[in-house]
Regions:
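Aromatic-anchored transmembrane helix interface
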Residues: 41-51, 70-82, 90-114, 124, ...
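N-terminal signal-anchor transmembrane segment
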Residues: 1-62, 75-88, 139, 356, ...
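Long extracytoplasmic/lumenal interhelical loops at the membrane interface
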Residues: 150, 157-158, 270-323
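Alpha-helical transmembrane segments of multi-pass inner-membrane proteins
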Residues: 122-149, 161-222, 341
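Hydrophobic transmembrane alpha-helices and their immediate junctions
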Residues: 185, 322-360, 386-388
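Transmembrane alpha-helices of multi-pass inner-membrane enzymes
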Residues: 24, 53, 351-360, 365-411
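A membrane-periplasm/extracellular boundary helix in multi-pass inner-membrane enzymes
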Residues: 138, 222-271, 291-295, 410
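Membrane-interfacial helix-loop-helix modules of multi-pass inner-membrane proteins that assemble, modify
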Residues: 32-37, 81-94, 127, 131-167, ...
Length: 411
């Protein structure tokens, strides 16, 4: 077996650690959050363009081979960009910004595809997921300690994402990537320990429930082979959970005043009160968006109306509102496609697909963020491991005199 050359080791190291770290920073919205908080002077668009350029260039020197399944995943983002930038069926003062945001996401999507088309794509995607989790939970802890302010909702911590509803989604998706790519149960449990405070500090109701289901299923299905380790983890985790609960409880107090919003959220999570787990405001927003979508059910009102005028907090209703029945069928069809493939391959990427689908009834706009693209492309690469390499080769000119001599000789 040939030993890798110094150049091979260098380009693979840059791919895994530099490009993977950049994708993790993009997934965690580290550039946007740090810039808006006044920590970093680098504008997010400059970081995005630099990351895309570096990832594509480094991928090209690592001999990429494309997973054709990612083209199916790219269909919905491409349709939404075409609808927003070219058709412009929904016209508003924010439409240019919406089109620019979708274009930015398509560039990030291409960069992720390029990186995950290389031979070391599994290590790179794994490091991207780990770094995104560390950045997200770390920024939330810094915010809790009063070192910096990111959140847009007082009383709930958000980290770089700025809105506390996004960190639980990101952390569960990144855990899904880790479960799909890493077979090391102890390392995966360590990453669960990283995710728990990141979700808890947001006081997110759906986030805590989905994290508990995801991690609970993973631990139970692997408990038999790791019983001794789990027993040790339980002994350590119980007092830590007690401390965590006390910290969360103290977070509902602001001096002598009690934050009713966070207190009610915490009570609903502790008691599994499904009536309190529901949000009356979200139910009203969903009904308003549903009524608007019903006015143009076939083709929708155009990309951009969801998130600017209406906030259905439901990805299916959001896409129905924007793209009509074709968009809804395309979105639901993508999930059916991934689920079918996962079942046929013995449950490959099952945790990741669950993490992706679980939040679709509880939020909107996830298809416009880097961590969703990273998770979707990773799922496609895991489920369809076959790769195709496109090369440009020139056919060598045939020596006519040589051919003529052969023909004469045969005659």
């Amino acid at each position: 077996m040939l030993r890798p050359t110094g150049w091979t080791r260098l380009r693979e190291w840059v791919l895994v650690w530099v490009c993977g770290g950049m994708l993790g920073a993009l997934a965690a919205d580290a550039a946007i959050g740090s810039y808006e908080a006044g920590i970093s002077p680098i504008k997010p668009i400059l970081f995005t363009l630099a990351a895309v350029f570096v990832c594509i260039c480094v991928s090209l020197v690592n001999k990429p081979r494309l997973c054709l399944a990612v083209l199916g995943v790219a269909l919905l983002p491409a349709v939404r960009l075409f609808d927003a930038a070219v058709l412009r069926r929904f016209d508003s003062s924010y439409q240019d910004q919406i089109a620019m945001d979708l274009m930015r996401m398509l560039l990030v999507f291409i960069a992720i595809v390029a990186v995950l088309s290389t031979e070391k794509w599994q290590k790179t995607a794994l490091w991207a997921a780990v770094s995104a989790m560390l950045l997200t939970t770390g920024s939330e802890i810094c915010e809790m300690l009063g070192m910096v302010k990111f959140t847009s909702i007082p009383g709930r911590f958000a980290g770089f994402n700025s809105h506390p509803n996004f960190p639980p989604v990101l952390l569960c998706e990144m855990l899904g990537i880790i479960f799909a790519l890493s077979k090391n149960f102890r390392f995966n449990c360590l990453m669960i320990a990283v995710a728990v405070p990141g979700v808890a500090l947001t006081y997110g109701r759906s986030g805590m429930v989905i994290l508990a289901l995801l991690c609970g299923a993973y631990v139970l299905l692997n408990a038999r082979r790791n019983f001794g380790f789990l027993l040790l983890v339980t002994i350590i985790a119980v007092p830590l959970l007690g401390i965590g609960v006390a910290v969360l409880q103290s977070g509902t107090q602001q001096g002598v005043m009690k934050d009713k919003n966070t207190a009610d959220r915490l009570e609903a999570i502790y008691n599994l009160d499904f009536d309190k787990l529901k949000s009356p405001e979200r139910v009203k927003d969903l009904n308003d968006a549903w009524e608007m979508a019903a006015k143009k059910p076939l083709l929708g009102h155009g990309t951009g109306i969801s998130g600017t005028i209406f906030a259905p907090h439901n990805e299916y209703v959001s896409l129905w509102l924007e793209l009509g029945i074709p968009g809804l069928v395309l979105f639901a069809g993508t999930w059916l496609w991934l689920i079918t493939r996962s079942v046929l391959t013995g449950g490959q990427a099952g945790y990741l697909i669950f993490a992706l689908i679980a939040y679709t009834p509880f939020g909107q706009g996830r298809i416009e963020v880097p961590h969703f693209s990273l998770a979707m492309i990773t799922a496609a690469c895991v489920l369809w491991p076959k790769r195709y390499q496109f090369t440009l080769r020139s056919l060598q000119a045939v020596d006519r005199s040589h051919v003529h001599q052969n023909v004469v000789g045969q005659a």
